[in-house]
């Protein structure tokens, strides 16, 4: 009882390390194994909380050694040990703990569950990434008789490790493994093309050698493309994450006519109180004019212009801070919300971007603002919320049918992310009729037409 009281008192007065030590004593003295297990784990967590990492690792290691069950808690604790060793740059112990996690999961039997598979899959991925890194660092140098077998063996080991991850049936980790398999093939292809050439060859011999290397290398590039495309098609089953986007980015570089299709937007509002959209080639009145109804002082206008100038000069965070202040000072001025949302988007803060753009839409003057709706469509796409992205683009076009930014982006969404070629062709052709000088979209139309014909 005294020990328990001390543990409580030390915790209350902020002496967390001393509280952890008392928890260890409670664990050692407890007759009930459940109490002992809980106290020991609590002690480790308290050490970890205070940054006493060596002590935390020691207690956690005692825990996993004494208490193999429940398996999921054992696995979670092993992850904490691994994280500590990673933070301490102790790679050997870090990878040892990951290997232990995989082994524990493989022996889980009836105790297996989604949490255990997730932890094991991520551990296996980290181990496979090490295999990939080791393989990628191998250079093909002369004599080939020595370096080529090492490179091939490294490739085989990396692919075997990555393919084993699929068995865990964890969607995000499967996508990561598939991405790395494709990159393994691509690295082997590039390594062949960039390999050291033999010396003392005539120009004719060298030309023949170059052709031979290319014949060997390009099939591996084709394999890389096929695997990246398989990962991309995984998205069409409803899975979307950073690894699928990474595969799509690689495909954009390898097959640009098919995959290099990037959304764009009108960008920042240049005026705090007036927005005008003039359709391309139009000579009559603007297609849309929006005028702010909230009062705007000269000081507010000056602060808005300052934040805009900061963004133009690449001073992202100061501008975000200033725009956040403006939205709190005058929450009814739509332009500040809009530019704050765009700035957060540019900074990669997608959730914050969505929040501020939605705030703008809630204001009467911006309820159907095409800039907001189009920017929000891009944000939704990046968040994997494709149906909402489509709704947002269509809302922009409902407000202003001539708004070419939304039209182009809707075509890309249908093409790359919804696999709806009819929609893609319709939007691309409508866009191209209004923007005939965009040669890139003309190429996309030809690409979609070819795929529809097949």
How should each PLM-predicted stretch be described?
Residues 2, 36-39, 73, 175, ...:
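TPR alpha-solenoid repeat register
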Residues 5, 39-42, 80, 180, ...:
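Canonical tetratricopeptide repeat
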Residues 8, 45, 70, 83, 129, 172, 299, 333, ...:
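Residue-level recognition of tetratricopeptide repeat
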Residues 11, 48, 86, 311, ...:
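Position-specific recognition of the canonical hydrophobic site in helix A of tetratricopeptide repeat
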Residues 137, 145, 293-329:
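Alpha-helical segment of the N-proximal tetratricopeptide repeat
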Residues 335-400, 405:
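Alpha-helical adaptor scaffolds
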């Amino acid at each position: 009882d005294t020990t328990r009281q001390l543990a409580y008192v030390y915790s209350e007065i902020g002496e967390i390390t001393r509280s952890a030590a008392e928890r260890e004593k409670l664990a050692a003295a407890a007759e009930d194994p459940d109490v002992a297990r809980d106290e020991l784990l609590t002690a480790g967590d308290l050490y970890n909380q205070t940054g006493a990492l060596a002590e935390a690792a020691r207690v956690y290691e005692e825990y996993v050694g004494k208490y193999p069950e429940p398996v999921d808690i054992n696995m979670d604790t092993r992850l904490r040990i691994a994280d500590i060793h990673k933070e301490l740059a102790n790679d050997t112990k870090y990878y040892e703990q990951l290997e232990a996690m995989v082994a524990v999961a493989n022996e889980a039997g009836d105790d297996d569950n989604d949490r255990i598979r997730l932890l094991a899959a991520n551990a296996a991925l980290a181990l496979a990434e090490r295999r990939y890194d080791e393989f990628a660092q191998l250079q093909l140098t002369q004599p080939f008789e020595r370096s080529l077998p090492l490179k091939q063996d490294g490739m085989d080991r990396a692919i075997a490790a990555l393919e084993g991850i699929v068995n865990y049936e964890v969607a995000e980790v499967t996508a990561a493994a598939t991405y790395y398999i494709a990159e393994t093939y691509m690295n082997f292809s590039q390594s062949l093309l960039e390999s050291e050439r033999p010396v003392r060859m005539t120009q004719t011999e060298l030309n023949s050698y170059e052709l031979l290397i290319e014949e060997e290398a390009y099939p591996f590039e084709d394999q890389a493309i096929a695997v990246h495309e398989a990962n991309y098609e995984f998205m069409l089953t409803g899975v979307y994450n950073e690894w699928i986007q990474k595969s799509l980015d690689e495909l954009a570089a390898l097959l640009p006519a098919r995959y290099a299709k990037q959304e764009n937007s009108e960008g920042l509002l240049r005026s705090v109180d007036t927005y005008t959209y003039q359709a391309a080639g139009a000579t009559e009145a603007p297609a849309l004019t929006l005028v702010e109804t909230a009062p705007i002082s000269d000081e507010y206008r000056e602060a808005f212009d300052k934040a805009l100038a900061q963004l133009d000069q690449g001073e992202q965070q100061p501008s975000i801070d200033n725009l956040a202040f403006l939205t709190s000072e005058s929450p009814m001025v739509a332009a500040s919300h809009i530019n704050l949302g765009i700035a957060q988007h540019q900074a990669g803060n997608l959730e914050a971007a969505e929040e501020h753009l939605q705030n703008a839409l809630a204001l009467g003057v911006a309820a159907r603002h095409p800039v907001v709706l189009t920017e929000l469509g891009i944000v939704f796409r990046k968040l994997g919320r494709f149906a909402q992205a489509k709704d947002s683009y269509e809302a922009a076009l409902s407000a202003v049918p001539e708004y070419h930014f939304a039209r182009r982006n809707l075509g890309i969404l249908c093409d790359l992310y919804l696999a709806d070629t009819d929609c893609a062709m319709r939007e691309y052709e409508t866009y191209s009729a209004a923007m005939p000088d965009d040669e890139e979209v003309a190429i996309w139309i030809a690409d979609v037409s070819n795929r529809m014909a097949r």
